[in-house]
Every structure is written in C-alpha cells, then in structure tokens.
C-alpha cells in the first residue's frame, strides 16, 4: 500500500517556489495530524505481513520521521506491532547509484545531493 501523503511541499522548491512562504507552523501541524491518520489507516488496512510505503515531498521532520515514530509508538501501545524496514537498502538496490543517507532505515532525498525534490520514504511492515 502506498501512502503518498498530502504535505507542505517544502521539499519541492523548484516546482513550488512559493510553498515555503505560504505555509505556517499551524499548516505543518495540521498536515502532520492528517498524515498520522492516513498512515494509521493504511497499516490497519494492509494484511499482516503486508508493507506500507509512506512518502512525502517534505524534508520537515514533523511530516516525516516524527509521523512514523508517533504512529508506530501509538500502535505498539495498542499491542499492534509494526516493523520499520530499511528503505535505504531498498533504494540502493533500485537506484543507479546509492542515495546519500542510504544507510538509514528511513530515506530522505535532498535536492542538492540527488538532484531530486526532498523526498522521504519509510517502509513499514505490519507484523500482526
């Protein structure tokens, strides 16, 4: 299941140069809450053993790593196990050259390093 979450767009300045001036802290917080809801719903929908790819075009930790952390902690407290797979390893196998930060479980691409938007990807497997 792919969750290509609506985000602030802060990671795509080439395509949306004004995004950083139009977004407020409140916008980012509201988007992060929506992102947590979407990721939680996707993990509830996928069968045990299934994988959810959570992606955004934002480099903001409130929309990326914190969303994954918050959702996995919340589900863990409910007794639902989710494993964060190694997205960096997956990207290394698929890309013509390893992206910067490929050693990390959650992958953050940067425009100045990869020539892409600031894309984020986390792969989560529902354990039970």
Which residues does each predicted region cover?
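C-terminal catalytic and target-recognition region of SAM-dependent MTase-like enzymes
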Residues: 2, 6, 48-128
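Mobile active-site "lid"/loop adjacent to the S-adenosyl-L-methionine
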Residues: 4-41, 47, 53, 58-63
């Amino acid at each position: 299941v792919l969750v290509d979450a609506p985000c602030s767009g802060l990671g795509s300045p080439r395509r949306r140069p004004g995004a950083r001036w139009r977004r407020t802290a409140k916008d980012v917080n509201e988007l992060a809450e929506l992102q947590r809801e979407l990721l939680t719903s996707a993990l509830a929908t996928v069968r045990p053993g299934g994988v959810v790819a959570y992606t955004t075009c934002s480099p903001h930790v409130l929309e990326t790593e914190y969303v994954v952390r918050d959702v996995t902690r919340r589900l863990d407290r409910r007794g639902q196990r989710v494993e964060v797979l190694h997205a960096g390893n997956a990207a290394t196998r698929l890309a013509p050259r390893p992206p910067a930060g490929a050693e990390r479980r959650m992958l953050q691409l940067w425009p100045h390093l990869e020539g892409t938007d600031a894309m984020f990807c986390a792969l989560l497997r529902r354990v039970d």
